[in-house]
Regions:
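Alpha-helical scaffold segments in carbohydrate-active enzymes
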Residues: 35-38, 42, 73, 77-80, ...
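An alpha-helical support segment within catalytic cores of ATP-dependent transferases
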Residues: 48-49, 80-133
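All-alpha amphipathic helical-bundle segments outside canonical DNA-binding/catalytic cores
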Residues: 197-207
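Active-site acidic catalytic loop and adjacent metal/ATP-binding pocket
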Residues: 113-164
Length: 252
C-alpha cells in the first residue's frame, strides 16, 4: 500500500519459531521441503501483468538470472579490491573477526576463478523459471512443533530457477553438502515437484557461489562501517558458519 509517499509491504503475522537448528529432525525437514515444492508448483502457473513481467514472469526454458548476477559480483571483487580488504581487516578488526575474515578472503583468492567458471559453464542450461523467494533460509521458516506454520519475508522474490531457493534453504538448514540430509531433502521435494539434471547442477553451483559471496558481503559491510559493535558477535557467528560451510564445499 502507499502512504505518505512511501510504499509499504504488509504481511500477516505468522505463528511459529525459526528453531530448526535447535530441534532438527527428518520430519521437520520433510515438512519444509514438501511445502516449498508446493509453493513452486503454484508459482510456476503465475501469469504476470504487463507491468510485473520484469520481475515476475514465467518461462518454461530460460537461463537462470542468478548465474549472470553472481558472475558480475565475482568480477567486482578485483585483485586490488581484495588487497585493500585484507589491509583494512588487518588494521581495523579485533582478533576473532580479523582471523575469520582473513580466512574467508584467503578462500576467495584461491577459489573465485573456479567458481566463476562453473557459473559461466551453466549459463547455457535452460530450465523453467518463475517467481521464487530467493532468500528462503533458516530464519524465515517458522515451525510450530513439527509443522511449518510460517514462510516469511518475501521481499527478495523475483523470477529465477527453483535452484535458487533450494540452494539457499538447504545451505542454511544443513550446510554440509555431504550430509545425507541433503539427499533426503531433495528426494522429498522431488516427490512433489520433480527436478531435472540441470536443476540439480544449478543447486550445487548456486550453493557454492552463495557461500563464497555471502562471506564477502559481510566483509564488505564491515569495511563500509555499516555494522555496529552490537552486531559484531552475531556477524562473527555468521562468518564462522560460512567458513565451516565453505570447508565442506572443498570436497565437492
Amino acid at each position: 500500500m502507499e502512504s505518505d509517499r512511501h510504499l509499504w509491504q504488509l504481511e500477516p503475522w505468522m505463528p511459529g519459531v525459526a528453531d530448526f537448528r535447535q530441534s532438527p529432525s527428518e520430519v521437520r525437514l520433510s515438512a519444509i521441503m514438501r511445502l516449498l515444492a508446493r509453493v513452486h508448483r503454484v508459482a510456476s502457473r503465475y501469469e504476470a501483468t504487463a507491468v510485473g513481467r520484469e520481475w515476475f514472469r514465467t518461462d518454461r526454458s530460460q537461463s537462470s538470472p542468478a548465474l549472470g548476477e553472481r558472475i558480475t559480483m565475482i568480477d567486482q571483487w578485483t585483485q586490488q579490491r581484495i588487497d585493500h580488504a585484507v589491509t583494512a581487516i588487518q588494521r581495523d578488526c579485533s582478533q576473532p573477526m580479523r582471523d575469520t575474515a582473513l580466512e574467508m578472503l584467503g578462500w576467495y583468492r584461491q577459489s573465485h576463478g573456479r567458481v566463476r567458471a562453473e557459473l559461466a559453464g551453466l549459463t547455457q542450461q535452460l530450465v523453467p523459471i518463475h517467481p521464487c523467494m530467493r532468500d528462503v533460509w533458516h530464519d524465515h521458516v517458522l515451525f510450530t512443533g513439527d509443522d511449518v506454520t510460517g514462510l516469511i519475508d518475501p521481499a527478495a522474490t523475483r523470477t529465477d530457477t527453483v535452484a535458487t531457493d533450494l540452494s539457499r534453504l538447504l545451505g542454511s538448514l544443513i550446510g554440509d553438502v555431504f550430509d545425507p540430509r541433503w539427499v533426503h531433502a531433495l528426494d522429498v521435494y522431488n516427490q512433489t515437484r520433480p527436478l531435472s539434471i540441470s536443476e540439480h547442477q544449478l543447486i550445487r553451483v548456486l550453493h557454492l557461489s552463495g557461500v563464497l559471496l555471502s562471506g564477502m558481503t559481510w566483509i564488505e559491510r564491515r569495511l563500509r562501517g555499516s555494522l555496529t559493535d552490537e552486531m559484531l558477535p552475531r556477524v562473527l557467528d555468521r562468518l564462522q558458519g560460512i567458513c565451516e560451510c565453505w570447508r565442506s564445499c572443498q570436497q565437492v
